[in-house]
Amino acid sequence: MKVRLGVDMMGGDHDPLVVWEALGEVLLSSIGEQPVEFTVFATSDVHHQLMNSPLSRSVRIVTAEDFVSMEDSLLAAVRKKRSSMALGLDALQQGDLDGFVSSGNTAALVTLARSKIPMISAVPRPALLVSVPTLSGFAVILDVGATVSVNPDEMVGFARMGLAYRQSLSSNSNQPFTLGLLNIGSEERKGTDSHKQTFRMLRNIFGSAFLGNIESGDVFSGKVDIVVTDGFTGNVFLKTAEGLFDFLRRILGDRLEKSIKMQFDYTIYPGSIISGLSRLVIKCHGKSHGTALFGGISGAIDLARANVCSRIADRFGDNVV
């Protein structure tokens, strides 16, 4: 299957050419040996810089009139109808792409994606889903920033999406997965009233698969396969983990084995998936360096090839709206 992947070159904290270099590395890797077609979305000045690059013969370039900056309000982002982000999502909505990757403004990407891409009808609200390495493999966490304030019903929806995601990527249809609610303590009485109600609902719905409240340290130990949280708490947790890993990488330097360095580089792999959409949208970190972008783009190709969004929708047994 040929994967048609769109990449937004604009809006991140890095130079757009860093994205271009990551694309080149993907095409030179074993991933690039499989059928893949890249379309990048960039402003005219960036397009001009790319014209003499040998890579331009292998990548389609779409010129955008503008781009969504990190400082743009949601209203400003929505008004930029011909931004690189908007054009990429339009192409995805029209079926010209199998997936879209952006390092741009998170709130704008979630809002624009939700307005342009049909949602799975059983999903109450989209969530940013990430995979993190654990002692037993990996765990998925959602939400990590799509929505700051959510209610218990929406948290249960996140749990269902996380479970559907794990099941959709598993080769064993009967493989059991466990869930935990990220909280300030493991006791049932801990947390806000919303957390307590969410705890009761998750226990009633998922039974023994729900292992109760978990603390931040439990995530990397591999205690559960799916971590459920609101966007505010999840985002703080994720950025704290990123900061810690970056600190360790800087302190230990060459003393880290190569395999461990790879784990740190791909802490968010393949970026944050906007789960709940019927089509694949990946949000890479705005500060992603070349190696992390390589991982995000490569992971997006793998997920598109696996038809992960269709599989999640099938798990919900529902149509899209």
Label every model-predicted segment:
Residues 1-47:
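N-terminal phosphate-binding or glycine-rich loops at protein starts, especially the Walker A/P-loop
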Residues 11, 15-18, 39, 43-45, ...:
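Glycine-rich phosphate/diphosphate-binding loop of Rossmann-like nucleotide-binding domains
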Residues 54-97:
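Phosphate/nucleotide-donor binding subsite
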Residues 113-141, 222-227, 231-321:
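Glycine-rich phosphate/nucleotide-binding loop
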Residues 33-36, 169-179, 208-217, 258-259, ...:
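Flexible, glycine/charged-enriched surface loops at secondary-structure junctions
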Residues 15-20, 49, 81-92, 99-113, ...:
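Short glycine/serine/threonine-rich phosphate/pyrophosphate-binding segments
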Residues 91-110, 190, 195-201, 205-261:
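Glycine-rich phosphate-binding loop
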